[in-house]
């Protein structure tokens, strides 16, 4: 009797497992890790509830310089898909993490590795040989491409296609999510373009070269940078030249990323009367900016307020 009872229990648990395991497999989400919060925001738009997504760099951090932590390795070891910005933006910290994760799915060239720059229109691609004397110039072009909504659309489409490759059963879901995102983005672009139209041609100065895609899309003229060269801290001589340029060009706005020191920009503002604005290059730079649409709403709102008050 004991043996029969044991067999019955074994069969019972086998049947339970047979029913539960397919359900668990069917409901398992793709585990997506991104290098930046912007890639995470776009992945969430098209992945919906079929993915879990986490970013390594947060929106208030400089994505060029991220301090590696053991927790990052834990995230990468469990990832089904890694999405990075590329163009060597993360070259100082991400490659060692990928290697040390020992996750074959996300190694460079593997099915679970996605460089989003391949989908985008890239600006400021250097001509000729690039040397360290020119600062931290990206030899493959400017990596801050997500600040153009057209590139955001391209990235989202590329991510949706990659998710479909990894999870063919949900391919139609990812395509539908992209189409819905595309409709909302097209409507938002019409609104943003209309809001910015009166300010096309306005001159601005930025701290770092993180603004060219945004500026080109909305018709702004970036006349100079607080950095004398990319990644090089401000120098007294360059600051004096920049102050003279701002006065000569009647520039009214200096834009600074949230992770740079405001001391030099504020001194420039005092000397020229230009407004110094901390704008957000990434989702999550402020708590209320939680998605791709809110990023543009926030930055455009700041710019319009600054342009209006300068007249």
What is each stretch, according to the model?
Residues 25-311:
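Extracytoplasmic metal-acquisition and chelation regions
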Residues 5, 19, 25-27:
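Intrinsic disorder/low-complexity segments
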Residues 9-22:
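Bacterial N-terminal signal peptides
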Residues 1-11:
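Bacterial N-terminal signal peptides that target proteins for export
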């Amino acid at each position: 009797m004991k043996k029969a009872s044991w067999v019955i229990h074994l069969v019972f648990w086998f049947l339970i497992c047979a029913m539960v395991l397919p359900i668990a497999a069917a409901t398992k989400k793709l585990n997506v890790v991104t290098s930046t919060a912007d890639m995470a925001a776009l992945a969430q738009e098209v992945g919906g509830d079929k993915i879990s997504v986490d970013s390594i760099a947060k929106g208030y951090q400089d994505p060029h310089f991220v301090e590696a932590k053991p927790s990052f390795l834990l995230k990468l070891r469990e990832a089904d898909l890694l999405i990075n910005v590329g163009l060597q933006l993360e070259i100082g910290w991400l490659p060692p993490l990928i290697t040390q994760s020992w996750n074959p799915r996300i190694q460079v060239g593997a099915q679970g590795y996605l460089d989003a720059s391949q989908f985008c229109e890239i600006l400021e691609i250097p001509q000729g040989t690039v040397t360290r004397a020119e600062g931290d110039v990206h030899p493959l072009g400017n990596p801050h491409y997500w600040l153009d909504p057209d590139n955001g659309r391209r990235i989202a489409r590329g991510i949706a296609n990659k998710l479909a490759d990894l999870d063919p059963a949900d391919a139609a879901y990812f395509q539908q999510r992209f189409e819905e995102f595309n409709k909302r983005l097209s409507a938002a672009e019409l609104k943003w373009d209309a809001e910015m139209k009166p300010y096309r041609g306005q001159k601005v100065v930025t701290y770092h070269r993180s603004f060219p895609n945004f500026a080109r899309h909305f018709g702004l003229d970036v006349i100079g940078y607080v950095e004398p060269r990319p990644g090089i801290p401000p120098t007294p001589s360059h600051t004096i030249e920049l102050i003279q340029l701002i006065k000569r060009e009647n520039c009214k706005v200096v834009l600074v990323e949230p992770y740079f020191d405001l001391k030099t920009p504020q001194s420039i503002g005092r000397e020229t009367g230009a407004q110094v604005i901390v704008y957000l290059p990434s989702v999550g730079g402020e708590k209320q900016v939680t998605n791709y649409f809110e990023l543009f709403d926030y930055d455009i709102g700041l710019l319009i307020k600054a342009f209006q008050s300068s007249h």
